[in-house]
Amino acid sequence: MKPLSLLLAVASALGTAVSAGPAVIECWMVEDAGGGRLAKKPAALLLRQGPGTPPPRPDLEPELYLKVHDPAGTLQAAVRRYPSDAPPPHCELSRFIPLPASARWARGLTPGRSCPRALDGAWLMASVLSPIFSLSCLLRPQSEPQPEPALFTSATAVLTVLTYSPIAQIQLGQDALLDLRFAYMPSISEAAASLAPGPPPFGLEWRRQHLGKGHLLLAATPGLHEQMPAAQDGAVAFAAWDDDDPWGPWTGNGTLWLPAVQPFQEGTYLATVHLPYLQGQVALELSVQKPPKISLTPAPLVWAAPGEAPPELLCLVSRFYPAKGLEVEWELRGGPEGSFQKAEGQSWLSALRHHSDGSVSLSAHLQPIPVTAKHHGARYACRVHHPTLPTLGRSAEVTLEVAGLSGPSLEDSVGLFLSAFLLLGLIKALGWVAASRSTSKDPKEKKAQ
């Protein structure tokens, strides 16, 4: 049993290591180089390490090799969920300057317009993008001296804004839930400057950008009783701190709920969390979709005489979204050339028909070529490809019957039997009625004699 226990322990350790996500996130430090140009330098976020000092990175400047301390654990929790076989996330670092919120509705967060001296010093904003999560993390490098030569820089994650739904695909007419969570842990100097225990006031802002236009969707400052702009499109946000621990760290929720999503609500959603003089923002992409319904007429059979063309086939592709990306193919299955081939004939598409819910419909037409006896039993199929459908698409089909080659089917045989049975019963009934009438007339005739 000991070897088995050891094997299970090793397997468990390997599973934990695989699911723990990357220990280092490679980044680019992006700065303004003047003249409308940007300068980029390699950087890295060290999230976990083994015993001892961090592994050396001679390819990085020490101030851009950041050993991150995450008191709230939000950044670490997000990275642990990252699949080991997924491409590495995209990460950028930039300089950040603490400033009061510029929006009028958020001015209650910062009664004093000057930034406290406790926030002086260098700040960095890390933006990490991936299909799994999207986050922004406000980092404060530590100023403690290190032994020469310095190999890395320690930094604390002060404010982390995170979403686990960076790409949301919502069915047309259904509700959308755009995930947003955030965590805050003030640095030592901030905590010393603030005498009030408990989480600070915060502001939540959701904006939508689409086709070059943007507008405020929802704004909230819980507990400040400020005059807020009216929410748009029925949007509701769960804006609150999750706990009220006196000294932090604190986590909060800013998830947005949109009822019965329509196509006009597609676009980029910007979620911003405002703290006094600090901000964090993430972007989410929302797209609306609806798979098409497909019907083919005439169905289920189409008739034609040898040498004649079958009647026109109509494939109705109804109630789908988006309108782009739709393709219709006509196939002939089981024909004389083999089990599968492209159907010959003249084909065309109708114009789009728009519906009140934002979905669209169109019809595809095919006028097949004249058929021969070899086409008997073949099937015409209308195959539709659309971004909302699987790779092979979706199809509907009808069976071709060539006149003069079809024997009676089982249904026809049953129908003929039932017809004959009813006819025989009818004849017997008429004979019984006639016999009854003749019998009733005989006694009357005898009395008359």
UniProtKB/Swiss-Prot annotation:
Compartments in which it is found: Endoplasmic reticulum membrane
Disulphide bridges: 27-91, 315-382
Signal peptide stretch: 1-20
Site feature location: May be involved in interaction with TAP: 428
Residue ranges occupied by any Ig-like C1-type domain in the UniProt entry: 292-399
Lumenal side: 21-413
Domain notes: The N-terminus is required for efficient association with MHC class I molecule and for a stable interaction between MHC I and calreticulin. Binding to TAP is mediated by the C-terminal region.
Protein name (database record): Tapasin
Organism: Canis lupus familiaris (Dog)
